[in-house]
A protein has these predicted regions:
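Structural alpha/beta core scaffold segments of enzyme domains
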Residues: 1-173
Length: 173
């Protein structure tokens, strides 16, 4: 949900549901072509998004602000729940290919792991998610020999985004 209301001169006030007001402010500023200090983002309350409203709510906020700037009237955008579920990104899918080295006693001596991550049509928060997955690739094991590679894959699907765990669950072995 986003409600954009024109202020004085080119100022814009946007009430939106976001976990990252600064990113929404930057997005609205860029779309309207106005300085960041002319954009005010207000968030009444936020909870339960688990990362899902960190970046993707900026699109709705910017769209409402653009319509409000063009019409010089307040504009509210509220997506139907099923539309919101289709448009909003989900947890990143990963595909793994690996080779594990084991000694004669059954101890893991090393791993060679490739992680391919479906990012979607734009990067969004994919670099951070992939970085976190790579950091968790060895999980709780001491592995004397490790090679981890991560590949963010651009696809024709909706952009995936932050989601509870932010790459850690995908990266754990």
């Amino acid at each position: 949900i986003a409600l954009a209301q024109p202020g004085e001169e080119t100022d814009m006030i946007v009430y939106c549901s976001t976990q990252h007001p600064t990113e929404a402010q930057h997005g609205v500023s860029k779309v309207l072509g106005i300085p960041i200090n002319e954009v005010t983002i207000e968030v009444r309350r936020m909870g339960g998004a688990f990362g899902g409203k960190e970046s993707q709510s900026t699109i709705i906020a910017a769209a409402a602000a653009l319509a409000a700037a063009k019409t010089k009237r307040p504009v509210k955008i509220r997506l139907r729940r099923d539309d919101d579920m289709v448009i909003t990104g989900k947890r990143h899918d990963f595909e793994f290919k690996y080779v594990v080295g084991i000694d004669d006693d059954g101890r893991i001596e090393g791993i060679d792991l490739d992680m391919a991550m479906r990012s979607g049509n734009v990067a969004d928060l994919s670099p951070g998610v992939l970085g976190r997955a790579l950091c968790h690739g060895d999980n709780c094991y001491y592995l004397p020999n490790v090679r981890l590679n991560g590949y963010p894959c651009k696809t024709n699907t909706v952009s995936n985004t932050a989601f509870r765990g932010f790459g850690a669950p995908q990266g754990m072995l």
